[in-house]
Amino acid sequence: MSYYNRYRNKRRSDNGGGNLSNSNNNNGGMPSGLSASDAIFDLGKNKRVTVRQFRNINLIDIREYYLDSSTGEMKPGKKGISLTEDLYDELLKHRLNIDEALRRLGSKRPKTKMVRLLSDDEYEDDNNNDSTNNDKDKNGKDKNSPKKRREDKSKASNESHDLEPRSKKKKPAPPTLLPHEENIQNAEREANATLIIPGQAGRKQQEERKQKEKEEAEEAKAKAVAEQEKEAKAKEKIAEPEPEPVPTLQAKKEDIVSNINESKDANSSDEEFAQSLEAEMNKAEDDISEEE
C-alpha cells in the first residue's frame, strides 16, 4: 500500500467514515457559519443544488451526482449548470412565462397569479422602509455600493413588472419543437427549396440564351412574312386595269366641243358679213363721188 492510500484511509477513519468526509469536502469553500446541510439541497434523483462561493462570487450549482462504487460516496458528475445571483434573479423574474410555456406544451400545471417568494417579502420590506433607508444614506451609507445598486435594480424591475398592463407584457416564447416535429419541418423546407448545382449554372444560362435567340428568330420570321404579304397586295392593286369611263360623260364632252365649234363658226360668219357690208358702203360712196 502506498503512502497516499495509507494517509487517506487514516484520515477517513479519523473523520468517522466516508459520510463525514463527504460533508467536510462539500463544506469546503463555503463561508464560516454555513453548514453543508444548509447549502446542499436534493433535486429528485441523483441531482443536487449547491450554494457556494468562488472568488467572492456567489454561485448556485445544479449538478448530477453518481455513487462511486469503490468509496461508496456520491461524487459530482460532468453534467451541470452554475448560476450567479443575477441570473438566478432573472430566472425567478420569468417564472410566469416559463409556467405559461410549459402549459402550452401540455403540462397540467395550475394557473396561478403569483408565486410568493422570500425575495418578494424582502422587496416589500424595502418599500416600507424607504424613508429610513434614505435617512441612513444621508447619514453616510454608500448609495453606490454593489449591493445597494442590485437591490434598487431588482426593486425597480419588480415594480415595473407589476404595474405593466397585460397588453404590453412580453408574450412567452413559442414552444420548442419535438425531434419528430423538427424533422417534419426540415423535410418540408427541403422539399420546397430550390436545388442549385454549381456545375449546372453555365448550362442553364446557355439554355436561356438559346431560348431567347429562338424567340427572336421566330419574331423576325413573322415580320418578314407580314412584309411579303403586304408587298404582294400592293402589286395586285397596281396590276388591276383602270375602269372604262362612263359613256354619258364622253357624250357630254362631245356636246361641249361641238357647241364650242359652232360658236366659233358663227363668230366667223358675222365677221365676213360685216366686211362685205362695209365694202358695199364704200363702193356706194365711191359711185356718188364719181357722179359729182
Swiss-Prot record:
<dbReference type="GO" id="GO:0051053">
    <property type="term" value="P:negative regulation of DNA metabolic process"/>
</dbReference>
<feature type="modified residue" description="Phosphoserine">
    <location>
        <position position="269"/>
    </location>
</feature>
<feature type="modified residue" description="Phosphoserine">
    <location>
        <position position="289"/>
    </location>
</feature>
<dbReference type="GO" id="GO:0006303">
    <property type="term" value="P:double-strand break repair via nonhomologous end joining"/>
</dbReference>
<comment type="function">
    <text>Plays a role in the release of TFIIB from the transcription complex during transcription initiation. Binds to TFIIB and specifically inhibits the formation of the TBP-TFIIB-promoter complexes.</text>
</comment>
<dbReference type="GO" id="GO:0032968">
    <property type="term" value="P:positive regulation of transcription elongation by RNA polymerase II"/>
</dbReference>
<feature type="compositionally biased region" description="Basic and acidic residues">
    <location>
        <begin position="251"/>
        <end position="267"/>
    </location>
</feature>
<keyword id="KW-0804">Transcription</keyword>
<comment type="similarity">
    <text>Belongs to the transcriptional coactivator PC4 family.</text>
</comment>
<feature type="compositionally biased region" description="Low complexity">
    <location>
        <begin position="20"/>
        <end position="31"/>
    </location>
</feature>
<dbReference type="GO" id="GO:0005667">
    <property type="term" value="C:transcription regulator complex"/>
</dbReference>
<feature type="compositionally biased region" description="Basic and acidic residues">
    <location>
        <begin position="133"/>
        <end position="166"/>
    </location>
</feature>
<feature type="modified residue" description="Phosphoserine">
    <location>
        <position position="119"/>
    </location>
</feature>
<dbReference type="Pfam" id="PF02229">
    <property type="entry name" value="PC4"/>
</dbReference>
<feature type="region of interest" description="Disordered">
    <location>
        <begin position="117"/>
        <end position="292"/>
    </location>
</feature>
<dbReference type="GO" id="GO:0006357">
    <property type="term" value="P:regulation of transcription by RNA polymerase II"/>
</dbReference>
<dbReference type="GO" id="GO:0045945">
    <property type="term" value="P:positive regulation of transcription by RNA polymerase III"/>
</dbReference>
<dbReference type="GO" id="GO:0003713">
    <property type="term" value="F:transcription coactivator activity"/>
</dbReference>
<feature type="modified residue" description="Phosphoserine">
    <location>
        <position position="268"/>
    </location>
</feature>
<dbReference type="GO" id="GO:0051880">
    <property type="term" value="F:G-quadruplex DNA binding"/>
</dbReference>
<dbReference type="GO" id="GO:0005730">
    <property type="term" value="C:nucleolus"/>
</dbReference>
<keyword id="KW-0597">Phosphoprotein</keyword>
<dbReference type="GO" id="GO:0005654">
    <property type="term" value="C:nucleoplasm"/>
</dbReference>
<feature type="region of interest" description="Disordered">
    <location>
        <begin position="1"/>
        <end position="31"/>
    </location>
</feature>
<dbReference type="InterPro" id="IPR003173">
    <property type="entry name" value="PC4_C"/>
</dbReference>
<dbReference type="GO" id="GO:0033554">
    <property type="term" value="P:cellular response to stress"/>
</dbReference>
<dbReference type="GO" id="GO:0070898">
    <property type="term" value="P:RNA polymerase III preinitiation complex assembly"/>
</dbReference>
<keyword id="KW-0238">DNA-binding</keyword>
<dbReference type="GO" id="GO:0003682">
    <property type="term" value="F:chromatin binding"/>
</dbReference>
<dbReference type="GO" id="GO:0060261">
    <property type="term" value="P:positive regulation of transcription initiation by RNA polymerase II"/>
</dbReference>
<keyword id="KW-0539">Nucleus</keyword>
<dbReference type="InterPro" id="IPR009044">
    <property type="entry name" value="ssDNA-bd_transcriptional_reg"/>
</dbReference>
<dbReference type="GO" id="GO:0006972">
    <property type="term" value="P:hyperosmotic response"/>
</dbReference>
<dbReference type="GO" id="GO:0005634">
    <property type="term" value="C:nucleus"/>
</dbReference>
<protein>
    <recommendedName>
        <fullName>RNA polymerase II transcriptional coactivator SUB1</fullName>
    </recommendedName>
</protein>
<keyword id="KW-0805">Transcription regulation</keyword>
<feature type="compositionally biased region" description="Basic and acidic residues">
    <location>
        <begin position="179"/>
        <end position="191"/>
    </location>
</feature>
<dbReference type="GO" id="GO:0045944">
    <property type="term" value="P:positive regulation of transcription by RNA polymerase II"/>
</dbReference>
<dbReference type="GO" id="GO:0071444">
    <property type="term" value="P:cellular response to pheromone"/>
</dbReference>
<dbReference type="InterPro" id="IPR045125">
    <property type="entry name" value="Sub1/Tcp4-like"/>
</dbReference>
<dbReference type="GO" id="GO:0006369">
    <property type="term" value="P:termination of RNA polymerase II transcription"/>
</dbReference>
<dbReference type="GO" id="GO:0075297">
    <property type="term" value="P:negative regulation of ascospore formation"/>
</dbReference>
